[in-house]
């Protein structure tokens, strides 16, 4: 449970930043992949 919450909490802000940068390249289906990497 803690690991899931930590992952979501850490991925939330990163996903926003990655989405803004990925928006220039390819933002189709990529956010999920970036979220996993984060």
From Swiss-Prot:
Report TM segments. none
Keyword annotations for this protein, in alphabetical order, are: Cell membrane, Lipoprotein, Membrane, Methylation, Pheromone, Prenylation
Q: Where in the cell is it found?
A: Cell membrane
Q: Which domain of life is it from?
A: Eukaryota
Q: One MF term in GO for this entry?
A: pheromone activity
Which residues are listed under lipidation as S-farnesyl cysteine?
35
Q: What is its main location?
A: membrane
Which residues, renumbered to this chain, carry the PTM Cysteine methyl ester? 35
- Which residues form the propeptide in this entry? 36-38
Can you supply one Gene Ontology CC term for this chain's record? plasma membrane
Q: Give the way it sits in the membrane.
A: Lipid-anchor
Q: What does this protein do?
A: Mating pheromone for A2 allele.
Protein name, as recorded: A2-specific pheromone
């Amino acid at each position: 449970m803690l690991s899931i919450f930590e992952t979501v909490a850490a991925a939330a802000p990163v996903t926003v930043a990655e989405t803004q940068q990925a928006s220039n390249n390819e933002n189709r289906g990529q956010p999920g992949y970036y979220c996993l990497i984060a």
